[in-house]
Structure formats: C-alpha cells, structure tokens
Amino acid sequence: MLDRGYTVVATDYLGMGIETVDGKQAGLGSYLVGDTAARSVLDSVRAAQQLEAAQAGDDVVLWRHSQGGQAVLFAAQEASSYAPELKIAAVAAAAPAADLTKLMGSHLDDISGVTIGSYAFPAFAKVYADVPGVALSSILTPAAIEKTPEMNSLCLLSSLTELHEIGQPLVGNFTLHDPTAVEPWATLLSDNSTGAKPFEAPLFVAQGSADELVLPADTAAFVSHEESIGVDVHAVTVDGASHGTIAYEALPELEQHVPINGGS
C-alpha cells in the first residue's frame, strides 16, 4: 500500500496501553467503547495529516480486525458529524466485534469471555461511571475484580499465554450475572454494538469459517442487518481461517473489492 501512494496509519486508542497507576489503568479505557474508539480512529487520520512528509489527504479507507473492526464501523457511522472533512472511500472489517451482546453471550463460560471481559468491563465502568449500577462490583466476582488490573496491563496479542494463565481459574467464576440480561450492562453492550445507522461508504466484511471467537453466524447476522438498512456490503468467508488469521488471509479479497489499487 505504501508503494501505491497510501499513507498507512495505526490507531492508538485512548487509554489503552497506558501504564498502570497503583494497580489501576491510568486514563479512560476505550476497549469496545464505540464512540471513543471511533474518534480515536478518525483522530489518527487527522494526526497523520499534520505530518508534512506523510502527504496524507482526505480520502480514507478504514480497515481493521476484531475490536478494531468495531472501531472502524463506528468511525464510519460517526465520520460525517465528527470529521466531516474526511471522505470515507470504503470500510473493511475482518471478524468485527459488531454485536457485543452476541459476543459476550457466546463466551460467558470460557476463557475468551474472561479475556475480553477483563478489558471491556473496566473500560465501561470508567467511561460510564455516571450510569447507576455500573460499578464493577455489580457484574464481576471479587476474584475477577482482583485479577482484571493485572490482565489489563498485558497485550492481547503478545501476552495471550500469560493472559490465559491468569484468567483460566476465573472461568465459571468471572461474572456475578449474565451481562447480556441485567442492567445497565445489557444496554451498554447494545449501545456499543454497531449498526445503529447506515453509512454511505461500501463495506467489505471478511469472516473465517474456523473462527471460534467472533462466530460466523453472528457475522452473517450483522451483514444481513447492514444490508437491510441500506449499506452496500460485500462479505466473504475464508474457509479454514481462524480469528487470528482472517485479517491476513482476507487480503487478496480485500485488494479486489476495496479501492486500494486506485480502482473504484
């Protein structure tokens, strides 16, 4: 993409990766918080435009995976109001965390749910601190509350083994209640799920058939919803691709259907 004249920008999400202070993450979290993540994505483009050598223009292709997929979908929804100077040419998401209710509901009693929850619940509790009943003690067990700061300090990609070692004893003892069924968590999960409003840019969605985190059926339901509200969607399923490999294995299809070759 660099050879084709594109400026490539990776988003530094608000609050994520910040050193902990007294065992607690400094700053507001943004993990799976749709509006915050969307603004981080759009602000990253604006930041690149401030670098003269980058020669970054206003035409933007948004492309991310998993949590990042949710972020670019929200960015596409919010771009016209938050960053109207940017022209979103296309949106692409691989195995996006599009429906948080389904994502959390599918993994309440496994290590994936513990891992995702260790990032998401503390982030929600900080961002929505003024919402009645949003304290971590309303949804997480004391054992989970004790371990989440340690898990928060680790990177999901580079420290997955360590994360799972910490989280495995919490499987079955992580939440006090089903967060998809009790308030205010059910509403927060719904509000941070994508698809509340359409956007004009074409959408490319890639899903791995062997993905055990973002389930193929959930992505198919998301695609159907986007189509029903008027979004131009091209969806592909890559046979045998897992959650960890789909972003790479979908690149050939991405190049065909997203304007990164100077095409339309």
Locate predicted features:
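Primarily recognizes the serine-hydrolase "nucleophile elbow" in alpha/beta-hydrolase
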Residues: 46-114
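Short beta-strand/loop motif that positions the catalytic acidic residue
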Residues: 199, 204-211
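Accessory cap/linker subdomain of secreted extracellular hydrolases
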Residues: 94-196
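C-terminal catalytic histidine-bearing segment of alpha/beta-hydrolase fold enzymes
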Residues: 186-187, 213-216, 220-264
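Short amphipathic alpha-helix adjacent to the substrate-entry channel of hydrolases
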Residues: 1-8
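Glycine-rich "HGGG/HGxG" loop immediately N-terminal to the catalytic nucleophile
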Residues: 15-30
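Alpha/beta-hydrolase active-site loop
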Residues: 30-52
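Solvent-exposed loop/turn segments at secondary-structure junctions
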Residues: 8, 14-18, 67-70, 97-100, ...
